[in-house]
């Protein structure tokens, strides 16, 4: 009797673990494209969306970081003297970047994530776009925002960088599942 119970329990465990593996595999996209998910995030909101996209499409995460990290005082958009306010009101501001260097030759598709600041992408994103050669790449913007749409920021990006091939953009203020589902649909 113990052997029958043992066999039954073993089969039950095996079938449950097999089903769990299949469910995990179904959430990921198999693509022959090499994907980078580059994002700028100061509070973690955009980072969560970027992480969900990278996990779903099998992309490498890359955090766009300024050479000097932002403090909470730097991000105080109500203070006209704050770093973010000065950067965003100075159209040609291009803050120096830190972090590891990239070889974009390794990638076909770049998801580009950022929060909406002053109805635009933050200036470090502009620095990133001007630092690297995006020839032959497709750049797919996504953003997070407390109240703005992505439309104006993408319009500005297309105007400033007309040689880049831009993919379908999306504002991702929902769940991380929404971010992953959208990413699967645009690859």
Where are the regions a protein language model picked out?
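Glycine-rich, N-terminal phosphate-binding loop of Rossmann-like dinucleotide-binding domains
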Residues: 114-115
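N-terminal beta1-alpha1-beta2 submodule of the flavodoxin-like/Rossmannoid cofactor-binding fold
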Residues: 17-109, 119-121, 126, 130, ...
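Short, glycine/serine-rich, charged loops/turns that create anion-binding
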Residues: 11-12, 42-44, 146
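Short amphipathic alpha-helical segments and helix-helix/interface helices
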Residues: 126-131, 154-158
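Bacterial Sec-dependent N-terminal signal peptides
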Residues: 1-24
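Short, glycine-/small-residue-rich phosphate/pyrophosphate-handling segment
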Residues: 140-176
């Amino acid at each position: 009797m113990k052997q029958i119970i043992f066999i039954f329990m073993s089969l039950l465990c095996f079938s449950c673990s097999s089903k769990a593996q299949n469910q995990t595999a179904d959430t990921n996209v198999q693509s022959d494209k090499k994907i980078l998910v580059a994002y700028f995030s100061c509070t973690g909101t955009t980072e969560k969306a970027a992480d969900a996209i990278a996990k779903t499409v099998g992309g490498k995460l890359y955090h766009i970081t300024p050479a000097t990290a932002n403090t909470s005082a730097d991000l105080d958009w109500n203070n006209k003297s704050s770093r973010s306010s000065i950067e965003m009101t100075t159209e040609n501001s291009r803050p120096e970047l830190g972090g590891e260097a990239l070889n974009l030759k390794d990638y076909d598709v770049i998801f580009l994530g950022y929060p909406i600041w002053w109805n635009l992408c933050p200036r470090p994103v502009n620095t990133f776009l001007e630092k690297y050669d995006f020839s032959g790449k497709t750049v797919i913007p996504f953003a997070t925002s407390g109240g703005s749409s992505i439309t104006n920021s993408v319009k500005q990006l297309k105007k400033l960088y007309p040689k880049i091939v831009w993919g379908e953009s999306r504002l991702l203020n929902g769940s991380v599942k929404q971010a992953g589902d959208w990413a699967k649909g645009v690859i």
